[in-house]
């Protein structure tokens, strides 16, 4: 191709590249604009309700002052139970997929089912637990039922993370440990888990960040409670459900609490996400 013919082609490619880059930047700015708008609205309305009463008083009746102490407690209990239930099962299932089911048909089936569960709407999981547990206990809503529905959200995230992280561990580490006569289970626990710990912990934190804002499954399981309750087999308040109730009410005091709860929840999710990224970054730096 002569220089005269190559020049227009080069110019056209440059123009296409500049246009594509410009469109990408505009799209990114468009998304950041609305994200900033949402965060600004959340901060401007939520800060008005941030005070000591928010964390020390219970949800109030209409047109009275109060806080979200019982809702914060309920969310902490249900999220903690969900992590406690979903994490061990997810780690064990992910370990089986990575170490034993990698080249088996059963492993392919489990991965397929896990992917379906990973993308399932949370309200479907809530209805499943409602049918499986709540209806079988005489329609008794409870924090435990809410934790079960959240555990079904945690489970596929931890399974996928554990599977991926263990498969990233170099096979030479497995072979070196096995060549020393170490049993397979010790290789998994003492070698593989240590190498993949940062990634697995990151997955658990991301699962926690996801379930902390879930509302739909709790509407069918934990329901809610206006009072302080520490019995996990009774209805219990949670921040997302209270926000859903208060935000749609005509009472200004409830709306202020809903905005404040949304701000606290957003900050919590942000801190958890930053912690997860910090763990991954520190692990990457230590390996480099």
How does the language model describe each region?
Residues 20, 97, 101, 163-167, ...:
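C-terminal transmembrane helix and the adjacent membrane-cytosol boundary/short C-terminal tail
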Residues 115-152:
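Generic hydrophobic transmembrane alpha-helix motif, especially the helices
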Residues 3-26, 40-84, 103, 245-256:
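Periplasmic/extracellular loop-to-transmembrane helix junction in inner-membrane transport proteins
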Residues 59-66, 218-266:
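Interhelical loop and adjacent transmembrane-helix boundary motif
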Residues 132, 136, 143-144, 150, ...:
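Non-cytoplasmic
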Residues 89, 102-107, 111, 170, ...:
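Amphipathic cytosolic juxtamembrane alpha-helices at the membrane-cytosol interface
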Residues 83, 161-162, 182-220:
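Transmembrane alpha-helices
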Residues 82-114, 127, 135, 276-285:
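Transmembrane-helix boundary motif in ABC transporter permease subunits
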């Amino acid at each position: 191709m002569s220089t005269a013919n190559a020049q227009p082609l080069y110019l056209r490619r440059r123009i296409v590249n500049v246009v594509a880059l410009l469109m990408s930047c505009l799209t990114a700015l468009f998304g950041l604009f609305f994200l900033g708008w949402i965060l600004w609205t959340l901060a401007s309305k939520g800060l008005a309700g941030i005070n000591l009463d928010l964390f020390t008083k219970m949800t109030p009746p209409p047109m009275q002052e109060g806080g979200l102490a019982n809702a914060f407690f309920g969310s902490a209990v249900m999220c903690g139970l969900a992590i406690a239930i979903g994490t061990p099962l997810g780690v064990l299932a992910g370990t089986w997929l990575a170490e034993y089911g990698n080249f088996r048909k059963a492993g392919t089936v489990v991965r397929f089912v896990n992917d379906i569960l990973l993308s399932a709407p949370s309200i479907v999981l809530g209805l499943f637990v409602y049918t499986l547990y709540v209806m079988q206990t005489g329609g008794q809503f409870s924090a435990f039922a809410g934790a079960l529905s959240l555990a079904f959200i945690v489970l596929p995230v931890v399974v996928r993370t554990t599977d991926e992280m263990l498969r990233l561990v170099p096979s030479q580490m497995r072979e070196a440990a096995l060549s020393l006569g170490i049993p397979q289970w010790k290789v998994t626990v003492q070698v593989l888990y240590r190498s993949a710990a940062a990634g697995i912990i990151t997955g658990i934190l991301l699962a926690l960040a996801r379930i902390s804002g879930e509302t739909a499954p709790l509407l069918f399981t934990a329901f809610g409670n206006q009072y302080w309750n520490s019995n996990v087999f009774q209805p219990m308040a949670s921040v997302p459900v209270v926000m859903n109730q208060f935000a749609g009410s005509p009472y200004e005091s409830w709306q202020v609490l809903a905005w404040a709860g949304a701000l606290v929840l957003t900050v919590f999710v942000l801190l958890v996400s930053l912690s997860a990224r910090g763990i991954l970054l520190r692990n990457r730096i230590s390996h480099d």
